[in-house]
Swiss-Prot record:
<keyword id="KW-0309">Germination</keyword>
<feature type="modified residue" description="N6-acetyllysine">
    <location>
        <position position="262"/>
    </location>
</feature>
<dbReference type="GO" id="GO:0015031">
    <property type="term" value="P:protein transport"/>
</dbReference>
<comment type="similarity">
    <text>Belongs to the ATG3 family.</text>
</comment>
<dbReference type="GO" id="GO:0006612">
    <property type="term" value="P:protein targeting to membrane"/>
</dbReference>
<dbReference type="GO" id="GO:0000422">
    <property type="term" value="P:autophagy of mitochondrion"/>
</dbReference>
<feature type="region of interest" description="Handle region">
    <location>
        <begin position="248"/>
        <end position="326"/>
    </location>
</feature>
<dbReference type="GO" id="GO:0005739">
    <property type="term" value="C:mitochondrion"/>
</dbReference>
<feature type="compositionally biased region" description="Basic and acidic residues">
    <location>
        <begin position="102"/>
        <end position="113"/>
    </location>
</feature>
<dbReference type="GO" id="GO:0034727">
    <property type="term" value="P:piecemeal microautophagy of the nucleus"/>
</dbReference>
<keyword id="KW-0963">Cytoplasm</keyword>
<dbReference type="GO" id="GO:0019776">
    <property type="term" value="F:Atg8-family ligase activity"/>
</dbReference>
<keyword id="KW-0072">Autophagy</keyword>
<dbReference type="GO" id="GO:0061908">
    <property type="term" value="C:phagophore"/>
</dbReference>
<keyword id="KW-0833">Ubl conjugation pathway</keyword>
<feature type="region of interest" description="Flexible region">
    <location>
        <begin position="85"/>
        <end position="166"/>
    </location>
</feature>
<feature type="region of interest" description="Disordered">
    <location>
        <begin position="97"/>
        <end position="171"/>
    </location>
</feature>
Length: 350
């Protein structure tokens, strides 16, 4: 079934009509030319990213120039698995976020995104509600949380030599992994699409089912599929984040940024400008509030939240908060919510 799905997706992109009309502000979609411009910006700003070419001319996408068929970054660290211990109880409360007006896809897809993580409404009370029970079944007083001063310091404890294990490299199985990330352009959805190829601590490629260990919650069943990367001849299975919801989510982020920029301009005119930090760093809170990031619902985003301008240029000279050539920087911030164990910021730290 997965192989058939992969073939269908490949044929969709191969035979879908390519639009060269920009609808970036209206739909969150981009044209091939805008994808190249955004890729050039990403490579210029963050040199860990580079352009890649197809293995053969027959595998090239005609709507993209040779040598700029896809973007790639290698050796991205991933040091922890997304098991039940990754986020404590936070990963146990999940809900499917259906398409609303802001997230309704343009291709007729009827599946939503999974919202996972975040404390439940009763979570902060759990520690205070614990009571002791005697042999007769009578409930005692509520247990009081331990004082930090009463917790013994681990450095004061002596190691028992009998339990020290030999950590010889030949017998040790490390949890460290690295990933190669690829970004291609999908003509059918008119958005970028991310592919991931993982490697174990020994440098050997990860089996496809092992890569799914680094995908958050039910995304692995609903949003992420195993597919062949269309530019490579030797059909290597990679994990791919399906782009059916990319455009509406990106449009929501762009609209929020523009609204915040407008508010900032008004404050500048009245001499009441906020001193908050400018730049992409301010995007983190907004992603945490989106349903796709696992921290909340887009409908609950405070429309008065301030997004700062992505550049440090004079605000009065800016028409929009995020330009089309900066699209992929925001896209990667958004897509990191699907694979939080993979250190995406590592690729943008140069």
């Amino acid at each position: 079934m997965n192989s058939l799905y992969s073939v269908v997706n490949t044929l969709r992109d191969r035979y879908a009509p390519v639009s060269h009309t920009s609808t970036f502000r209206q739909t969150g979609e981009i044209t091939p030319e805008e994808f190249v411009a955004a890729g050039d910006y990403l490579v210029f700003k963050f040199p860990t990213w580079s352009w890649g070419d197809a293995d053969s001319e027959s595998r090239r996408a005609s709507h993209l120039p040779p040598g700029k068929q896809f973007l790639v970054t290698r050796n991205v660290p991933c040091n922890r698995r997304l098991n039940e211990n990754f986020a404590g109880d936070a990963g146990l409360e999940e809900a499917v976020v259906d398409d609303g007006d802001e997230f309704k896809g343009s291709k007729g897809d009827d599946d939503g995104w999974l919202r996972t993580g975040g404390l439940s409404s009763s979570q902060p009370l759990k520690a205070r509600e614990v009571r002791t029970v005697d042999d007769a079944g009578n409930a005692g007083e509520r247990a009081q949380p331990d004082d930090d001063d009463d917790i013994p310091d681990m450095e004061d404890e002596e190691d028992d030599e009998a339990i020290i294990r030999d950590t010889d490299a030949s017998g040790q199985t490390s949890s460290r992994r690295t990933y190669t990330l690829y970004i291609m352009y999908s003509p059918y959805y008119r958005t970028p699409r991310l592919y991931l190829s993982g490697y174990g601590a020994n440098g050997q490629p990860l089996p496809p089912h092992n890569m799914m260990e680094d995908i958050m919650g039910d995304y692995k069943d609903k949003t992420v599929t195993l597919e062949d990367f269309p530019f490579f001849a030797n059909n290597i299975k990679m994990a791919s984040v399906h782009p059916c919801k990319h455009a509406p989510v990106m449009k929501t982020l762009l609209d929020r940024a523009d609204a915040a920029l407008k508010l900032r301009r008004e404050k500048l005119k009245t001499g009441d400008a906020s001193g908050q930090q400018a730049g992409l760093e301010g995007l983190a809170d907004e992603f945490n509030k989106l349903g796709v990031s696992g921290k909340g619902d887009a409908s609950k985003i405070d429309k008065n939240d301030e997004w700062e301008d992505i550049q440090h240029d004079d605000v009065a000279d800016q028409e929009v908060a995020i330009r089309v050539d900066q699209y992929l920087v925001v896209f990667l911030k958004f897509i990191a919510s699907v694979t939080p164990g993979i250190e995406h910021d590592f690729t943008m730290g140069v």
